[in-house]
Amino acid sequence: MSTDPTSKPAFPITDEVRHALAVTKRGVDELLIEEEFAQKLAKSAATDKPLRIKLGLDPTAPDIHLGHTVVLNKMRQLQDLGHTVIFLIGDFTSLIGDPSGRNATRPPLTREQIESNAKTYFEQAALVLDREKTEIRYNSEWSMPLGADGMIKLASRYTVARMLEREDFTKRFQGGIPISIHEFLYPLMQGYDSVALNADLELGGTDQKFNLLVGRELQKQYGQEQQCILTMPLLEGLDGVEKMSKSKGNYVGISEKPTDMFGKLMSISDVLMWRYFELLSFRSLDEIARFRGEAEGGRNPRDFKVMLAQEIVARFHSQADAERALEDFNHRAKGGVPDDIPAVTLAGAPLAIGQLLKQAGLVPSTSEALRNIEQGGVKIDGATVSDKALKVDAGEFVVQVGKRRFARVTLTA
């Protein structure tokens, strides 16, 4: 079927359609092709038939962080406009491993890892999406039955030259870095998902653009109306430099405790705060612009950071949790010890300070403990520890690492 708008009857672009298009475009990096999507929206409004909106996520890790919610928020906005959202769990494509943005082959996950991670994926995503209006699918439904014959036929629809147009593949090829054949299959399988689901729009991060376009091309080859493409920006992590990633430690998990989530959000820079407002807040753009004007006019940016942190904590927990998190944050800022810190009993006194911090669960390793001591970030009963060779005697005390990690330690011989 041709996707040339001139070959199909044009549907009227009403105020309702213009509003839906404006909602769709908020905060996006790119919408391809906007004129086509406007017609899809117009047709949907005229025929009262919802669009099929696809988002695929590979369960490569068990937890979803705020970076993932940028695209989930957009899905919810489209859902609220009345469209069908398809939350696609890439249990088959996870066996391949997405090479997007990689400079080396990504190790595929085992079936056991995938199944374990997938269990918690939608439960967390449902904190953003409307569970009752979400279609949950697994791409193994249609990918596994393909078999060798079907896979060969699918592979014949795309050339190696086209695959090498992708920037990360090009860099690896030119740099003599190996590219495995199975990595070429990933964009094809993701694209085939769009054929199987007959998607009208597919969402993804900016690093997914090539894969999304493969889906559009395959739909054309299979005689379907081509999906439009919507890419969302990658959210910077707490450091404001690299994209949010659990492996980089610069993330905020959506299942974290309210106090931890609030504290992490309050740690971001004033500049990064506005980026988070744009991509994570449900407030109107006009309201955010007004906040920014007030900050530029002299109002303390901390006021707006508190609003942002409370909004996000309330979304994933409750308004009461957000209020308590603010109280806890203010208490800590004044040098107070939180009421809900964990109690830990350790043995082996006198115990090296690095071991104590690790065994108390305050740091992942002794080397991390020593780094925190060097930076003046470790306190025992409020006194800063400066001696990395310190041996801690038996007793009861409160240990603090950084601004947010506390433990009430009982150390015995």
Curated annotation (Swiss-Prot):
Reaction catalyzed: tRNA(Tyr) + L-tyrosine + ATP = L-tyrosyl-tRNA(Tyr) + AMP + diphosphate + H(+)
Motif 'HIGH' region location, chain numbering: 59-68
Amino acids binding ATP: 246
A biological process from GO: tyrosyl-tRNA aminoacylation
Keywords linked to the UniProt accession: Aminoacyl-tRNA synthetase, ATP-binding, Cytoplasm, Ligase, Nucleotide-binding, Protein biosynthesis, RNA-binding
Any GO MF annotation of the entry: tyrosine-tRNA ligase activity
Domain S4 RNA-binding, chain residue ranges per copy: 351-411
Location (main, coarse): cytoplasm
Subcellular location field: Cytoplasm
Chain ranges for the short sequence motif 'KMSKS' region as given in the UniProt record: 243-247
KW tRNA processing (keyword) present: no
Superkingdom field: Bacteria
Pfam family, any one: tRNA-synt_1b
EC number: 6.1.1.1
Coiled-coil intervals: none
InterPro entries in the record: aa-tRNA-synth_I_CS, aa-tRNA-synth_Ic, Rossmann-like_a/b/a_fold, S4_RNA-bd, S4_RNA-bd_sf, Tyr-tRNA-ligase, Tyr-tRNA-ligase_bac-type, Tyr-tRNA-ligase_bac_2
Transmembrane annotation, as ranges: none
GO cellular component: cytosol
Record NCBIfam families: tyrS (TIGR00234)
Family named by the database record: Belongs to the class-I aminoacyl-tRNA synthetase family. TyrS type 2 subfamily.
Protein's job: Catalyzes the attachment of tyrosine to tRNA(Tyr) in a two-step reaction: tyrosine is first activated by ATP to form Tyr-AMP and then transferred to the acceptor end of tRNA(Tyr).
Subunit and partners: Homodimer.
The protein, known as: Tyrosine--tRNA ligase
Organism, as annotated: Burkholderia pseudomallei (strain K96243)
